Structure formats: structure tokens, C-alpha cells
């Protein structure tokens, strides 16, 4: 599921960052000792929060491109009934718009999947 993919990514990303703390953006010397470890956790949390927000916006753009662009989503194309396909595309575009314009509304990935379920239920 979407929630599992994000949770695994987040966990593994943090594991790798903690195991290999190298690079110019977050030099190890800045994060030594207990205060440094706390500061690093705070930096990691902030970085992942920004990455998550950006990922939501990117996902919204991809959803729009796959609905309106030339590279259509094959799952939508397989819906033979044009009215049903159009309804699915409208729901997809609605969620995509919200992901782009209101990413802060979705603090955790479960809120994204819950919103998708709400949009589907409202149009049923």
C-alpha cells in the first residue's frame, strides 16, 4: 500500500543517514554528543517533512499528467464505460489538485489515503 511504501522509505532513509553520516550539508562534527544527536534528529525530521511535502506535490503533478497528458494511466484506459472512466478521472484530478495546492493538509500519508477514500465515497 501507499502507506507501507512511505513508512518503509522513511525508516530506511533514516537508517542509512544515521549509519553513514557524511556529506557537506550535515557534517558529523556539528552533531556530536547528546545535544548533537538531538539536533540531528530534529534536522532529519525537518528534512523528511519537506521531502514528504514535495513528494505530495510531485505525486499530484504526476496524477494530472497521467490523466490529461499523452502518457495515460493504463488502469483508467481499461475502463470501457466512458462515463465511469470520466468519473474516475475527475476523482483523480480532485485529489491531485489538493495534493499540489494543500500539501500541508496531509500531515501523514494515512491522511492522503483517507482523503482518496472520502473523495470516492462522496462521488458514489
Where would I find each of the regions flagged by the language model?
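Glycine-enriched catalytic-core subsegment of oxygenase/oxidase enzymes
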Residues: 1-2, 15-19
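Active-site Asp-x-Gly
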Residues: 1-11
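Short, glycine/acidic-rich hinge or "gate" loops at secondary-structure transitions
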Residues: 18-28
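Regulatory N- and C-terminal appendages and interdomain linkers associated
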Residues: 25, 31-124
Amino acid at each position: 500500500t501507499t502507506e507501507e511504501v512511505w513508512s518503509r522509505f522513511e525508516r530506511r532513509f533514516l537508517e542509512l543517514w544515521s549509519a553513514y553520516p557524511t556529506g557537506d550539508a550535515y557534517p558529523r562534527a556539528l552533531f556530536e554528543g547528546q545535544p548533537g544527536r538531538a539536533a540531528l534528529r530534529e534536522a532529519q525530521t525537518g528534512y523528511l517533512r519537506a521531502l514528504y511535502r514535495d513528494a505530495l506535490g510531485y505525486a499530484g503533478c504526476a496524477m494530472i499528467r497521467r490523466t490529461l497528458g499523452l502518457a495515460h494511466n493504463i488502469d483508467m484506459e481499461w475502463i470501457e464505460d466512458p462515463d465511469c472512466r470520466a468519473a474516475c478521472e475527475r476523482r483523480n484530478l480532485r485529489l491531485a489538485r489538493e495534493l499540489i495546492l494543500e500539501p500541508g493538509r496531509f500531515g501523514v500519508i494515512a491522511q492522503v489515503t483517507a482523503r482518496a477514500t472520502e473523495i470516492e465515497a462522496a462521488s458514489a
